[in-house]
Curated annotation (Swiss-Prot):
<feature type="compositionally biased region" description="Polar residues">
    <location>
        <begin position="524"/>
        <end position="534"/>
    </location>
</feature>
<comment type="function">
    <text>Component of a cell-surface receptor complex that mediates cell-cell interactions between muscle precursor cells. Promotes differentiation of myogenic cells. Required for response to NTN3 and activation of NFATC3.</text>
</comment>
<feature type="region of interest" description="Disordered">
    <location>
        <begin position="524"/>
        <end position="547"/>
    </location>
</feature>
<keyword id="KW-0732">Signal</keyword>
<feature type="glycosylation site" description="N-linked (GlcNAc...) asparagine">
    <location>
        <position position="426"/>
    </location>
</feature>
<protein>
    <recommendedName>
        <fullName>Cell adhesion molecule-related/down-regulated by oncogenes</fullName>
    </recommendedName>
</protein>
<feature type="glycosylation site" description="N-linked (GlcNAc...) asparagine">
    <location>
        <position position="179"/>
    </location>
</feature>
<feature type="domain" description="Fibronectin type-III 1">
    <location>
        <begin position="572"/>
        <end position="673"/>
    </location>
</feature>
<dbReference type="GO" id="GO:0009986">
    <property type="term" value="C:cell surface"/>
</dbReference>
<feature type="glycosylation site" description="N-linked (GlcNAc...) asparagine">
    <location>
        <position position="569"/>
    </location>
</feature>
<dbReference type="GO" id="GO:0007405">
    <property type="term" value="P:neuroblast proliferation"/>
</dbReference>
<comment type="subunit">
    <text>Part of a complex that contains BOC, CDON, NEO1, cadherins and CTNNB1. Interacts with NTN3. Interacts with DHH, IHH and SHH.</text>
</comment>
<feature type="signal peptide">
    <location>
        <begin position="1"/>
        <end position="24"/>
    </location>
</feature>
<feature type="domain" description="Ig-like C2-type 5">
    <location>
        <begin position="404"/>
        <end position="515"/>
    </location>
</feature>
<keyword id="KW-1133">Transmembrane helix</keyword>
<feature type="domain" description="Fibronectin type-III 2">
    <location>
        <begin position="719"/>
        <end position="814"/>
    </location>
</feature>
<dbReference type="GO" id="GO:0060059">
    <property type="term" value="P:embryonic retina morphogenesis in camera-type eye"/>
</dbReference>
């Protein structure tokens, strides 16, 4: 078993408290101070500062003003200050401040400056002549540079970086050529290289060295021509230059104050120069370079050397303890070259002279001291090349204690809504005072039940009895020091805050004002979705314990204001991983889905989503919209978006520690949907369906391993949007871009590449660009050249794909590479309006027309046609290899004049032909996404600039009307075609039915000079006065009633007992029609009935009467063929008596008595008559001659009926029924015409008795 460690832990805890108490009474001092730095603009700078004791708090000053931790581009973490991206506003003097309950001290200044390299002065070519075997001198005026530039030379096309052979690069930047020969003649150019920015600038003109033969013109001091004054830093290497020609270096002497400068010193000879590796202040003086010859001539040049000294303090401050009302003197003796400035500080604040604070030389005098005068005093000496400070502590005694004094008062601060704010207050006193904070609502404590809160943003989701236990204020206090932190500041937190330090001797107060500005002035009010409300209300009504209430919040509330170790060691959450694709199929909505990153040890309270619309062309952006999402959500539905638009999204996660790094995404909405395409639109989930929850990493089917969606994330970020280029200076540009999705890991840096046109290599323009910086300046571009740029995003997984190259950008100015400008311009061959804001044009350019003069690109000019002002022309620049271009940002339904020029360094060509093209009509909501394509502008036949091609004929609003009318007519034609097809189909069905169950046809004769109708008469023995009953055939029945002509009276009455077919029942379903027949009375007393006789044609004999009356023609039949007769006029019939004859009839059939028809026989309906007739034979009953009915009913069928009974035969012959009868004319089918007849006659057949 392990021994009980309880007492040991208690002892350790007591020791820690004692050490803390002792250290809290120690004055702070610095272990390390920040150092000056020179850095390239856009690159990061890191400054370090550390102090003891451990209770000391570190803060920073910039140019004497306190730095806020929320300052843009600056990150402060403990003793480290990081400038994320250096810009001119962040350059200057930085100091760190260490403070505790004793007081505060300030460090020495660290200068942060931007590296830069100036330009050479433009000058004409200088010609220098040097003698052989003598010394040559090439002068160079090195431009200003920070840090000092390295000098290089380009000699006859080759670079010289260091002294080599007979070439010596002097510290001043000049070049000395020893032992000149003919090989040394040629061109010499001086160059300056900045080691920080890696810039190299070359002298534009340079020097030309000529070599001559030796002469006896004496000697000369080539450099320096005049005496020089030098101020150098101590312990630095120094070279005093003296370039002499005409004498050897051994005849050059160096003197200091008239004495030999080399003997007994650390100076040495270097050719004809005097050098030392480390100069001391004792080396200050006058140095002379003396040259003489054998003839006694002497020449000299003098250097006045001044060695500077760092500031120093020979007598510093001492700690003092005085009583109230006494006078205090602090002495500070400073030295240095130049003389340093002396500055006094009290608790890191400069002391301004007053009636109680007086400065007299090296003494600070404080009269009538009060408790507020206690603390730390500093004397700071600074002469520009060095810094020195001395610190002393002032303690004031009052009855073994004194009233608290606020050493560091809280500062006024202005923050944005939602930021993290910290107010600090340090006080001293005996005993150590207790610090309290007061707001406008009174005392602020860290107990959850007494914490002041802002109004809940979703107050309507909570019942009046609910409590908002999310901590808003957090107070961290130590002995004599206290900090008030507001985790997510809101507008309600704005106002005055008071820090009060209290002990038994009294209290002291200090005030600070907190100003809160809205995060964005157009921030939308937060809305609550139904799902959120339902989730908040889904609690057990019976569970009213505090634990169940706390479970509603992700932040754990502690019962006291003491910070737990978990909170102290926690970090800000990582950026969320956005899972949504960069495009959406919806025109006005977007579903943003994400997965939470690492929470840093504290739960995520909320997500803040900012989005705005971007403009693809100009890069202009819309206003930000901000939405707050609860930390438990992982999805947000963005609405009221614009179709076909690009949007940018920034998203951060916030916990109790603070906000994490933002995640960035750009997405594009789809085109607006048409009403006709509603069937293709994706269906929306029904209202009230919960959002898709986040899958727990430990509860999925992959044993706790989260599998990323490879279709959504490949790890590396998406390529940024195409960058936009704007002018920064004559030789530099600003490259601006918009990032896209980060690929699941936050973007750590960007890289910009550039390419000069007509070259194939992409070069790096800037790298390691911080993710918060979306613009960078690219310098040292060649004037007159055309460049393209692209951007690369970098995260933990690697580099993204390269973005689309920017539009070609031409740098101002020309390097005069080509002196001849092109004369003949291009020829515009084709223009077309591709949308309501874009026009595309194509052109041709023949280099031979300009003697193959190289060109750099084309200028495209365009303006509205109705404008006569040349200043209205706008210009697009296109590279020389292009042959087409799209002009954007035009007005809808507007005609434009378009012309072109080609250009190079020498100038522009003449204008091309002018084309006129009109943009399309702006598409209204609901119109087709694919309008009728307009006619393009045909090319002009002339290449003159004044000729104008014909304009296009744009589709206007009337074309839409024509389109609608055409669609309606097309639909009508389609309906008509369907109707005709149905009619044809119905006719075919009827033909099929008639094929298997054909009715009797009514034949119509041909219309000739006369008409003939066959009639049959019955003899007197045929019971003329009788009635004919059962005139009905099983194939169909027709009641034929023909009206007789005037003057003819009588009735043919016949009775067929049992019907025509006694063996048949009336099973017909076909419609039957009655026809009236005329009856005629002749002189012999016979009654004749005019019955249209039907022609049997081919049907002579019948084999099967009952098989649907299908008859077959027999060639050996004894029956004659009766010709088809035509229709007849009712008033012109010739009647003949019928003789009795014996005719075979169909087998007996049964029909209902009294010749009645079935119920479905309609009086006015006539079934179509088939073209082929059958002959059916059967026995029939006797004919009843006693019938007196006026009408005789006959069976309408395809066969002739023949009767044979008791030596009496009655014959029915099928006759032709005229299709023009009044009752049946509309529904009777016309039969094919019969054979032609020569005249109108009536054939009467008499029945013969056998």
């Amino acid at each position: 078993m392990h021994p009980d460690l309880g007492p040991l832990w208690t002892l350790l805890y007591v020791l820690v408290i004692l050490c803390s108490s002792v250290s809290s009474d120690l004055a702070p001092y610095f272990i390390s101070e920040p150092l000056s730095a020179v850095q390239k603009l856009g690159r990061p700078v890191v400054l370090h500062c550390s102090a003891k004791p451990v209770t000391a708090r570190i803060s920073w000053l910039h140019n004497g003003k306190r730095l806020d931790r929320n300052t843009e581009q600056i990150k402060i973490h403990r003793g480290t200050l990081t400038i994320l991206s250096l810009n001119p506003s962040l350059s200057g003097c930085y100091q760190c401040v260490a403070n505790n309950s004793v007081g505060a001290v300030v460090s020495g200044p660290a200068t942060v400056s931007a590296a830069a390299l100036g330009d050479f002065d433009s000058s004409t070519m200088h010609v220098i002549t040097a003698e052989e075997k003598n010394t040559g001198f090439i002068g160079c005026r090195v431009p200003e540079s920070n840090p000092k530039a390295e000098v290089r030379y380009k000699i006859r096309g080759k670079w010289l970086k260091h002294s080599t052979g007979n070439y010596i690069i002097l510290p001043s930047g000049n070049l000395q050529v020893l032992n000149v020969s003919s090989k040394d003649k040629g061109s010499y150019k001086c160059a300056a290289y900045n080691p920080v920015t890696s810039e190299l600038k070359v002298e534009p003109t340079g020097r030309k060295l000529l070599v001559s033969r030796p002469s006896s013109n004496g000697f000369h001091i080539l450099h320096p021509a005049l005496s020089q004054a030098l101020a150098v830093l101590p312990h630095s290497p120094v070279t005093l230059e003296c370039v002499v020609s005409g004498v050897p270096a051994s005849q050059v002497y160096w003197l200091k104050d008239g004495q030999d400068a080399v003997a007994g010193s650390n100076w040495r000879r270097l050719y004809s120069h005097l050098a030392t590796a480390s100069i001391d202040p004792a080396d200050s003086g006058n140095y002379s370079c003396v040259v003489g010859n054998k003839s006694g001539d002497v020449k000299h040049v003098t250097y006045m050397v001044n060695v500077l000294e760092h500031a120093s303090i020979s007598k510093g401050l001492h700690d003092q303890k005085v009583s109230l009302g006494a006078t205090v003197h602090f002495t500070c003796d400073v030295h240095g070259n130049p003389a340093p400035n002396r500055t006094w500080f009290h608790n890191a604040q400069p002391i301004h002279p007053s009636s109680r604070h007086l400065t007299e030389g090296n003494v600070l005098k404080i009269t009538r001291v009060v408790m507020e005068d206690s603390g730390l005093y500093q004397c700071v000496a600074d002469n520009g090349i060095g810094f020195m400070q001395s610190t002393g502590r002032l303690q004031i005694e009052q009855d073994s204690g004194w009233k608290p004094v606020i050493v560091t008062a809280p500062a006024n601060i202005e923050v944005m809504d939602g930021d993290f704010v910290t107010l600090s207050c340090n006080a001293t006193g005996v005993p150590v005072p207790v610090i309290h904070w007061y707001g406008r609502h009174g005392l602020i404590t860290s107990h959850p039940s007494q914490v002041l809160r802002s109004k809940p943003r979703k107050s309507h989701l909570f019942r009046p009895g609910d409590l908002d236990l999310e901590p808003v204020y957090l107070i961290m206090s130590q002995a004599g020091s206290s900090s008030l932190s507001i985790q997510a500041v809101t507008l309600e937190h704005a106002g005055k805050y008071t820090c009060e330090a209290t002990n038994k001797h009294g209290s002291t107060q200090s005030e600070a004002f907190l100003t809160v500005v809205p995060f964005e002035t157009n921030t939308k009010a937060e809305s609550v979705t139904p799902s959120e409300a339902s989730q908040n209300d889904e609690r057990d009504p019976q569970d009213g314990s505090e634990s169940s209430l706390l479970n509603l919040f992700p932040v754990k509330v502690h019962p006291s204001g003491v910070e737990l170790p978990a909170e102290r060691n926690a970090s800000v959450p990582d950026a969320p991983n956005i899972l949504s694709p960069p495009q959406t199929h919806m025109p006005d909505t977007y579903n943003l889905v994400w997965r939470a990153g690492r929470d840093g040890g504290m739960p995520i309270n909320a997500y803040f989503v900012k989005y705005r619309k971007l403009d693809d062309g100009s890069g202009a952006v819309g206003s930000w919209h901000t939405v707050r999402v609860p930390g438990s959500e992982n999805e947000l539905h963005l609405t009221e978006l614009e179709p076909s638009s690009l949007y940018e999204v920034l998203m951060v996660a916030r916990s109790a520690v603070g906000e994490g790094q933002p995640a960035m995404l750009t997405f594009r909405t789809s085109k607006e949907k048409m009403a006709s395409s509603k069937n293709t639109q994706a269906s929306f989930p029904p209202v009230g369906v919960p959002k898709r929850p986040v899958t727990a990493e430990a509860s999925n089917s992959n044993f706790g391993v989260v599998l990323t969606d490879s279709s959504r994330h490949s790890g590396v970020p998406e390529a940024p949007d195409r960058p936009t280029i704007s002018m920064a200076s004559e030789t530099s540009v600003y490259v601006t871009w918009i990032p896209r999705a980060n690929g699941g890991s936050p973007i750590t840096a960007f890289k910009v590449e550039y390419k000069r046109m007509r070259t194939s290599d992409w070069l790096v323009a800037a790298e390691d660009i911080p993710p918060s910086k979306l613009s960078v300046e690219v310098r040292s571009l060649e004037p007159g050249s055309i460049y393209k740029f692209r951007v690369i995003a970098i995260n933990h997984y690697g580099e993204s794909f390269r973005s689309s190259a920017s539009r070609p950008y031409q740098v101002a100015g020309f390097p005069n590479r080509f002196s001849n400008r092109p004369i003949t311009g291009p020829h515009i061959a084709y223009t077309e309006a591709v949308s309501d804001t874009q026009i595309m044009l194509k052109w041709t350019y023949v280099p031979s027309s300009n003697n193959n003069t190289p060109i750099q690109g084309f200028y495209i000019y365009y303006r509205p046609t109705d404008s006569d002002n040349d200043s209205d022309y706008k210009r697009d620049v296109v590279e020389g290899s292009k042959q087409w271009h799209t002009i954007g940002h035009l007005q809808p339904e507007t005609s434009y004049d378009i012309k072109m020029q080609c250009f190079n360094e020498g100038g522009e060509s003449e204008f091309s032909n002018v084309m006129i093209c009109e943009t399309k009509v702006k598409r209204v909501p609901g119109a087709s996404d694919y309008p009728v394509k307009e006619l393009s502008t045909p090319p002009s036949s002339s290449g003159n600039a004044g000729n104008v091609g014909p304009a296009t004929s744009p589709a206007r609003s009337s074309d839409m009307l024509y389109l609608i009318v055409g669609c309606v007519l097309g639909v009508m034609v389609l309906i008509l075609m369907v109707f005709i097809a149905l009619c044809l189909w119905k006719s075919r069905q009827q033909s099929t039915i008639q094929k298997y169950d054909p009715p009797g046809y009514l034949y119509q004769g041909s219309e000739i000079n006369g008409q003939m109708v066959e009639y049959t008469t019955l003899s007197g023995a045929a019971r003329i006065n009788g009635s004919v009953h059962g005139g009905f055939l099983s194939n169909g029945c027709s009641h034929l009633h023909h009206k007789g002509p005037s003057g003819v009276n009588g009735t043919l009455s016949g009775n067929i007992n049992g019907g025509l077919y006694s063996a048949h029942t009336n099973s017909l379903t076909r419609a039957c029609v009655e026809f009236e027949h005329p009856h005629h009375l002749v002189n012999s007393g016979g009654v004749y009935t005019a019955v249209p006789q039907m022609d049997p044609l081919e049907c002579i004999n019948c084999r099967n009467c009952r098989n649907n009356n299908r008859c077959f023609t027999k060639t050996n039949s004894p029956l004659p063929v009766v010709p088809v007769v035509a229709s007849y006029p009712q008033g012109g019939l010739e009647m003949k008596p019928l003789n009795a004859m014996k005719v075979p009839v169909c087998p007996a059939s049964t029909v209902p008595d009294h010749g009645q028809l079935p119920d479905d026989c309609v009086k006015d309906s006539v079934a179509p008559i088939p073209t082929q007739h059958t002959c059916c034979q059967d026995n029939i009953s006797d004919i009843n001659s006693d019938s007196t009915e006026d009408t005789a009913e006959f069976s309408r069928g395809d066969s002739s009926g023949h009767s044979e009974a008791e030596d009496k035969v009655f014959s029915w012959n099928p006759l032709i029924l005229s299709p023009v009868l009044e009752d049946c004319g509309e529904k009777t089918a016309r039969s094919p015409p019969g054979p032609p007849l020569d005249g109108l006659s009536v054939v009467l057949q008499q029945a013969q008795e056998t």
